Amino acid sequence: FSTKGNGLVKAEPDMNSPQGLRFVRYKNDPKNPNSISSNDVYFTYQDSQGRIWVGLLGGGLNLISEANGTIAFKHKYNGLKQYPLYGLYMEVRTMTEDNDGRIWVGTMDGLMSFDGHFTNPEEIQFETYRQVSERSNVADNDIYVLYKDSESQIWVSVFGGVLNKLVHYD
């Protein structure tokens, strides 16, 4: 479950609980570099490889990894080494994946994408896309929704209600 200010909450089966569930909360811990990078969770997404991604407001994109029963969050501060460095793309609102396995990330600062066929998160090469024009303003880059329709076309909705079709990408 995504929360505003209280981190990420995971529900696990627990037959000893009256509800049959146990809830585990993951919050940012400044002393733990493998903790989630922000407590403001906006979006979670599972890609075609089964990986769980977490979009955060102020914390960018996190990838959940699990080893020996321990959960770790990979992000720009500890494992996504190629993440944009200049302070943009830290408010992640939405994600989708195209039919070629490319993952698209909508942020308040524009669109970001990367090849989902990777073995090591440190090797992910992020590409960024921003609207720049004479009439451009912040709203042109503020992406609310990425939607893949039944024909696998990706649609981009930005602040102010503008809807764009992602036509060509390499």
Task: Tell what function each PLM region has.
Residues F1-D170:
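Carboxylate-rich, polar loop motifs that coordinate divalent cations or form catalytic acidic clusters
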